Amino acid sequence: MRCKTLTAAAAVLLMLTAGCSTLERVVYRPDINQGNYLTANDVSKIRVGMTQQQVAYALGTPLMSDPFGTNTWFYVFRQQPGHEGVTQQTLTLTFNSSGVLTNIDNKPALSGN
């Protein structure tokens, strides 16, 4: 009888604590990287006054371009390391009607480490 009681108590205790895992970081979670991966060195290659072709050669194809034809390119990189928070890097490039780069907006700014 004592063995049955001990087994039942252990089973109940196991069920009650099953959702309270303190070993969350033991479970493998892969890093999820999406978009255009750019380093600070890549961003430093572009300058106001470059053409769209020069920018595309330096950085590659943008993830998105403005669908309304205002000549805006978006390079977005989103990273979610396994057990950490999500970070997002957005580089927005604006061109004039001649296809010349007029504005660079880098949020949050990449810093060379």
Curated annotation (Swiss-Prot):
This chain's protein is named Outer membrane protein assembly factor BamE
Q: One GO MF term, please?
A: identical protein binding
Signal peptide annotation: 1-19
Q: Where is the lipid attached (S-diacylglycerol cysteine)?
A: C20
- Residues with covalent lipid (N-palmitoyl cysteine) sit at C20
Assembly state and interactors?
Answer: Part of the Bam complex, which is composed of the outer membrane protein BamA, and four lipoproteins BamB, BamC, BamD and BamE. Forms a subcomplex with BamC and BamD. Monomer in the periplasm, but is able to adopt a dimeric conformation in the cytoplasm. The Bam complex has the shape of a hat, with the BamA beta-barrel crown in the outer membrane and the periplasmic brim formed by the BamA POTRA domains and the 4 lipoproteins. The intact Bam complex can have 2 BamE subunits.
Purpose of the protein: Part of the outer membrane protein assembly complex (Bam), which is involved in assembly and insertion of beta-barrel proteins into the outer membrane. Nonessential member of the complex that stabilizes the interaction between the essential proteins BamA and BamD. May modulate the conformation of BamA, likely through interactions with BamD. Efficient substrate folding and insertion into the outer membrane requires all 5 subunits.
User: InterPro entries annotated for this entry?
Assistant: BamE, BamE-like, BamE_dom
Q: Give the family, as the similarity comment puts it.
A: Belongs to the BamE family.
Q: From which source organism is this entry?
A: Escherichia coli (strain K12)
On the tree of life, the source organism's domain of life is: Bacteria
Any idea which UniProt keywords this protein has?
Cell outer membrane, Lipoprotein, Membrane, Palmitate, Signal
Q: List the membrane topology term(s).
A: Lipid-anchor
Q: What happens when the gene is disrupted?
A: Mutants show minor defects in the assembly of outer membrane proteins.
**Gene encoding it?**
bamE
Task: Give the CC-aspect GO terms.
Answer: Bam protein complex; membrane
Compartmental location: Cell outer membrane
S-S bridge residues: none
Q: Which GO terms describe its biological process?
A: Gram-negative-bacterium-type cell outer membrane assembly; protein insertion into membrane; response to antibiotic
